[in-house]
């Protein structure tokens, strides 16, 4: 299949490899970006792409807390200009507060909630859309419950483009907020390595076994090296094993232990996570308009 310049650029942005290497990998992978990344990693030319690296949509995230319940939401807009204005921020807070109040099951149920007599949450979103002139959508949310002995910690980064919500047991709200800051900044995927699904580990092992630097090595040596790399991989994606963002001399596990607590769960939202933004070629668009 024909490989486009846009595909090559996207792969280079994600892996930092050269243009020809990116194109060769895409050709070999039949244009499949994820497969191309794996092929480059097998050749030792690229690191693992982070799960949340496809960020494209605009908008903001927010966290609302009410007693033993908290909600984290993502509200999308078409441009960052609208995402930063007063009307959008007012809507963002209203949506978060409504969701934490009623704990709806899903987005559809949330949009049907009555925020005031005769007006649903969806009506309110449509009203703000009419004011701003841009389509605004509630993309997703999570509602988290805690016990009386537990504490919430939340942190918003880069003017709400990233938010994190953490539940700790035994530790203070301040400690929970510090861990939420770490989650927002470092983007772990799991609390601990025992939560990593077997298929994720199996895929990583497959990639490592195919690494060119293992060619010709005895099987027992190869197995030991792969085992070490898997251990490192698990530490990189597991919150408790990561160096703590506020003190790199200790892990998150050591920090929370020093606070006489434990991490129960976390949720991290980054605006546009997993959404591919449509890129328009200006010259092509003008040509179309001119017929």
UniProtKB/Swiss-Prot annotation:
Keywords: Cytoplasm, Elongation factor, Protein biosynthesis. SUPFAM superfamilies: Elongation factor Ts (EF-Ts), dimerisation domain, UBA-like. The lineage of its organism: Bacteria, Bacillati, Bacillota, Bacilli, Lactobacillales. GO terms for cellular component: cytoplasm. Residues 79-82 are annotated as: Involved in Mg(2+) ion dislocation from EF-Tu. One of its GO terms (molecular function) is translation elongation factor activity. HAMAP family: EF_Ts (MF_00050). NCBIfam families: tsf. It is found in: Cytoplasm. The keyword Hydrolase does not apply. PANTHER family: ELONGATION FACTOR TS, ELONGATION FACTOR TS, MITOCHONDRIAL. CDD domains: UBA_EF-Ts (cd14275). Associates with the EF-Tu.GDP complex and induces the exchange of GDP to GTP. It remains bound to the aminoacyl-tRNA.EF-Tu.GTP complex up to the GTP hydrolysis stage on the ribosome. Transmembrane segments: none annotated. It comes from Leuconostoc mesenteroides subsp. mesenteroides (strain ATCC 8293 / DSM 20343 / BCRC 11652 / CCM 1803 / JCM 6124 / NCDO 523 / NBRC 100496 / NCIMB 8023 / NCTC 12954 / NRRL B-1118 / 37Y). InterPro entries: EF-Ts_dimer_sf, Transl_elong_EFTs/EF1B, Transl_elong_EFTs/EF1B_dimer, Transl_elong_Ts_CS, UBA-like_sf. Belongs to the EF-Ts family. Gene3D superfamilies: 1.10.286.20, DNA helicase RuvA subunit, C-terminal domain, Elongation factor Ts, dimerisation domain. This is Elongation factor Ts. Pfam families: EF_TS (PF00889).
């Amino acid at each position: 299949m024909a490989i486009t310049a846009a595909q090559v650029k996207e792969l280079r942005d994600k892996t930092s490899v050269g243009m020809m290497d990116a194109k060769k990998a895409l050709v070999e992978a039949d244009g499949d970006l994820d497969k191309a990344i794996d092929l480059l990693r097998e050749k030792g030319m690229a690191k693992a792409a982070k799960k949340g690296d496809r960020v494209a949509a605009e908008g903001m995230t927010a966290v609302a807390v009410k007693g033993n319940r908290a909600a984290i939401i993502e509200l999308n807009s078409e441009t960052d200009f609208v995402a930063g204005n007063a009307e959008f921020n007012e809507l963002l807070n209203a949506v978060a507060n409504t969701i934490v109040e009623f704990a709806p099951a899903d987005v559809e149920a949330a949009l049907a909630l009555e925020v005031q007599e005769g007006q649903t949450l969806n009506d309110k979103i449509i009203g703000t859309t009419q004011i701003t002139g841009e389509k605004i959508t509630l993309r997703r949310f999570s509602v988290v419950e805690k016990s009386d002995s537990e504490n919430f910690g939340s942190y918003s980064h880069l003017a709400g483009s990233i938010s994190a919500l953490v539940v700790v047991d035994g530790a203070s709200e301040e400690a929970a907020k510090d861990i939420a800051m770490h989650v927002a900044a470092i983007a772990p995927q799991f609390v601990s390595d025992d939560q990593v699904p077997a298929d994720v580990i199996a895929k990583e092992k497959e990639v490592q076994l195919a690494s060119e630097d293992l060619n010709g090595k005895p099987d027992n040596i190869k197995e030991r090296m792969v085992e070490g790399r898997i251990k490192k991989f698990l530490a990189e994606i597991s919150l408790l094993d990561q160096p703590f963002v506020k003190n790199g001399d200790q892990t998150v596990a050591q920090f929370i232990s020093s606070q006489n607590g434990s991490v129960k769960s976390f949720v991290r939202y980054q605006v546009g996570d997993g959404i591919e933004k449509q890129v328009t070629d200006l010259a092509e668009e003008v040509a179309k308009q001119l017929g």
